[in-house]
Amino acid sequence: MTGVQTTAAAPPQASPRVKRYLPWVVATALFMEQLDSTIVNTAVPAMAAGFGVTPLSLKAVVASYILSLAVGIPVSGWMADRYGTRRVFAWAVGLFTLASALCGLAPNVPMLIAARVLQGLGAAMMMPVGRLAVIRTFPKTELLAAMNFVIIPALIGPLLGPTVGGLIVHWLSWRDIFFVNVPVGLAAQWLIHRYMPDYRGEATRPLDLVGLVLFGAGTALLSWLLEIFGEHRLDLGAGVALLALALCLLAAYGVHAQRSEFPLLRLVLFRVRTFRVAVVGGFVTRLGIGVMPFLLPLLYQVGLGLPAWQSGLLMMPAAAAAMGMKLIATRVLAVFGYRRVLMANTLMIGVTMALFSRVGPATPLALIVALGLCMGFFNSLQFTSMNSMAYADIEPADSSMASTIASSMQQLSMSFGLASGSLVAAWYLGAVPQTDRAAVVSALHHAFLALAALTALSALAFRGLKPGDGDQVAGRGEPAG
């Protein structure tokens, strides 16, 4: 998934040395980004204790990173075309590394959130541009092997992140989870300047500044409103006025995108039914799925009183099951088809999320592990299905923009889901201190049930698919015609 607009030119002849080491360069950056995105969740209770705040109030530390990813991804393509892949990739890794150090040094929550925004902006440019360099370097006959090597860290990072985070917090300090990125980032910079090719677009499209302001301001304001709604920091009148402003900004972007020759996101692609169903259905589904990696460590540490390292270990089964599902997902789709898989699997995710509402201090660890395995198994099948379905009927010339839209919507839905899930938990917790374990467990149980219901209802969105949709992608036979 990339936000880069590639040219139609064939890849240039890269040297054997570049081909040998470029996948390592991109994989190193991806590992750093994926590790950081999962390592933070386990450390939230320790951060809260260090800053003297409640764990739920730190949702913005996670949401700000995801939101800046959503806003920054569409700009990455323009940056690479204008300034070149080597320079932009080096900037992105440098910004991510610097922001990681600033996170570790942050004296208060606002500074930590600001540093996380910078981290997200670096990550938003880092991976799309890295993938573009790989695509432009390798011919089609070698591209699959190169891309498979590059995405391995995307699978390993979520597996190691919670455990590494838990161990670092337990034996060192939560600040050290950010300092881990510094030596990796410095090593990546050395590799970039030695082995990263420098590609530029043949014809740079103008940057849609108006669209960027409208889309960025609207989504940021809406996410912020969801974040603070449960904290009662705004009266009803001000909240309604700001909500109306956020919706007006997004509506204005919709009008602007229809009229602009080079919009930030080409909304006309939503006329493609399979793309529309996959992205919209996936948006609603991820509202529930995206918040679980944040709420589960709170349940384990704050609610059940488990140490950070044990909480991290309990997150590993989901990542392991997700990797296992990757081996059979293609076969499942080939046998049952996209429509049946997405509808049934979405319901199973909802059921699994609801079952977490039964987890309490007396629940055997084996049962918690089993639920984690189920969650990872179903989530992996869902992401594989939605991500591939989105491009089933997209023309090759539109694939880059379609990927940009899908990537931005994915991050945006996770940001909104995190804010919404935390809002539900805070709403049920009320004025009860978050040191009251029984109250925290009860509030989180209510959040799980609400998110489970929302996720299950999102299965209805996939009814918009036809039985034969995606059959060619799934390898179920020749397309009808």
Residue ranges and their predicted role:
Residues 133, 137, 167, 191, ...:
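A residue-level signal for alpha-helical anchor/packing sites in multi-pass solute transporters
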Residues 19-35, 40-42, 51, 55, ...:
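12-transmembrane solute porter fold
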Residues 104-111, 193-196, 226-232, 254-258, ...:
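Transmembrane helix-loop junctions and nearby membrane-interface residues
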Residues 170-281, 306-307, 314, 451-452:
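Hydrophobic transmembrane-helix bundles of small-molecule transporters
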Residues 70-71, 101, 155, 159, ...:
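Hydrophobic/small/kink-forming positions within alpha-helical transmembrane segments
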